[in-house]
Amino acid sequence: MTTDIHHPEGATGAGAPRLIGLDVTRAIALIGVVVMNYHGFLNDPATGNGRWSRFFHVFTGPLSTRFAATFVLVAGIGTALLAAGTLNKMSGTSHGTLRLRLARRGTVLIVGGYFLNMAWPGTILFFYGAYFLLSALIITLRTRYIAVVGALSATAAVALALWESSRRSAGHSTAWLLPYEIHSAQDLLCRIFLSYTHPVFPWFAFFCTGIILGRNLRNLIHFRTQLTVVCVTILMCTYGLATILSSTGQRDNRVVFVLTTMDPFSHGLFYILSTASIALLAFLIINQTAERFASTKLVMTLRRSGQMTLTLYLAHVLVFYILVKWSDLIGATGLDTSLTFAVCFWIFGISATSLWHHHFGRGPIERLYRLIGG
């Protein structure tokens, strides 16, 4: 096996040490993404209205989009580390070269995601491409300006949600903001920036949060406890206040409801704050646990598989089509089916990709992605 493509589990393609927490977080978050996706397709409305079905509901459940947000946060961290590694490895590398690399990767993802979306509506790859393209514009800015960009993304989402609610209450249609299919440039821009599953407003705020965290990752041990306390406090305040307002009838007010809703498609203030906090907490907990048990077989397996999540993500779509769409071996019979299907895929996928990475290094889709995207 040629060593120029097969790097140790603890090293990046450039030879720099890999951060185990990032890879393990990706591998664990993947099971959540698979569960939510499979449940979204396999939930039978006739049997899927129970408490647990609502809990796992892909659109309205409390877990909806939280796993994907963790992926976006980690992608932001990885982008910050990529930028630092690229500029440090080659001191003569210009900012333009770094921006071009990110733009190439973003273009690959947005084009590939566009076509995948035809078979797998709502795929995050399409939006990932937009995040990378935008990151090419801001990656060399100072951290304070990255924070401003993230805050503007979140603010724009909340402002849009309030405006849309106002228009609907006045009897005006806002359907043009929510194109299910892309037939024009307007549909494309609305899909990327404003609507559907993971639009730039507010999701780029999660990506910017990751960039900021990635730039300060070396000092994480010094502020990890404080950051955890802040995240827990935000969660307690958002969920607690939303519950109190509901019990007192205050959320009957349209503006209050939009600001405090946890519905991911409403893009309210409380949704943004709680989702960012959950993603940060997930990373902090998984990262610390992975570092503590880094030498265990389970963590090593997750570490290898976490470096092949792009391959695993596309594989979960292919497996779904083979077993559900094409052969009808699995049907929409409820939550038990989707959970069993997702867990079986995850166990097999994690084991297979770990074995692949151990023997061959980088995954097949990751190699293609790097070949085209740089």
Feature-to-residue mapping (PLM):
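Alpha-helical transmembrane segments and their immediate juxtamembrane cytosolic regions
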Residues: T2-G374
